[in-house]
Each structure stands twice: as C-alpha cells, then as structure tokens.
C-alpha cells in the first residue's frame, strides 16, 4: 500500500511540474525581435550601387577633369556646427539658417568640429591621383571671410595645384543655385548627398553621384538615395 501511495505522489508531482512548464511557455511573451538570417542581411535596395573602386575604374583612360563636391554631409559630417547654431540662434527652429551671424561662425572656424567622411577621403585621394581639379560647391551662404577652403585642403591633403577656393552658392527659393557653377566651371562629375545636388548635375548633363547622408545628421528628412536613377556609393554614410 505504501508503495502505491509513493507512486501516486511521484506521478502527481511530475504532472504538476509539467503543467507549470507548459503554462510558463504559454504565458511567455513573443520575442520583441524575431531574429534574422543571412538572406535578409544580404538584401539591398534595388538601386545603382557603386564602389569607389568602380568609379575609379570607369575613369581609366580619361584625361584629368574638373570634379565637384558638395560639402555638408557629403565630405564633412558638419552637424555639430549646425546643432550649435540652432541652439545659439534659434532654439527649436531653422531660422538660424537665415542669420548672417551663424554663417560667419560656421564658415570661420566651426568646421573644426566637423568630421571628415572616410568616403570623401577615398574619393578625393583618387581624383587627386588622377590629376583632377577639385571644386567644392556648397549651399552655405557666402561670408566676408572663410576658413572652409583651408580646412578642406588640410583635412583631405589636397595639393595646391588641385585645390580651388570653396564656392558659396547660397540658397535661393525656387532656384538650384549650384547649376550655374557646375556649368561655369565645366564640372564633369559632381558628388552630393541631397536631391538638389543630383538634379543640379542632371540639369547640366553632369555625372551626378550620390553620397549617403549619415542617419544622425541634423539635416532631416533623409533623402531617398537612388530616386533619380543615379549611382549611389556603398558604405558612404561615414
């Protein structure tokens, strides 16, 4: 009788433990992140991706030319200066972009806080090696003095023979201010992160190549790279 009682007790205990485990599994919340696999990780947006090496290869046999670069978010991660400008001159709004005092600061020293992008180092080095003439065309407002040209030349080790002073195209409503400069300087290739950079290039028949804007840039919203069928450089967000 005692053996039967012990067997029944063991069975009841086992049943209770099993029920507890089942209930625990049933009540557990589904994982927040379902995980991924190699196929998903390898997915890329169906746009015209290119590497710096592929761009270089496409230029083999071509003589030296004039090439242009936008500055902010293309060759420099300059959000620190713009962030400080907003906090200083117009907290919570973009009014600081119309304030000449901000541009005097930004164009005369605040780029010391800007981070040169690695993709820009690779691109500029490649074009310098080819003997190309380097232009920087920015939408920043022009100021009486500027140190941006020297900062860029120092950051990217551009020889004097290849370097041209920064062109401050400014920003005018309803007008793409970079177009005239691309035409005037006979630019053959233009790199930029914004839609205006790509459309300016296309408007004058120039090869426009998209550089990805970093996701933590203060310049929002992020543009849709590849939307105009342009080439987009891989891993160019930094």
From Swiss-Prot:
Organism: Enterobacter lignolyticus (strain SCF1)
EC number: 3.1.3.2
Any one Pfam family match given in the protein's UniProt record, by short name: Acid_phosphat_B
GO molecular function annotation: acid phosphatase activity; metal ion binding
Cellular component terms (Gene Ontology): outer membrane-bounded periplasmic space
Gene: aphA
Keywords: Hydrolase, Magnesium, Metal-binding, Periplasm, Signal
Major location category of this protein: periplasm
Assembly behavior: Homotetramer.
Highest classification ranks of the organism: Bacteria, Pseudomonadati, Pseudomonadota, Gammaproteobacteria, Enterobacterales
Protein name from the UniProt record: Class B acid phosphatase
CDD domains, per the entry: HAD_CBAP
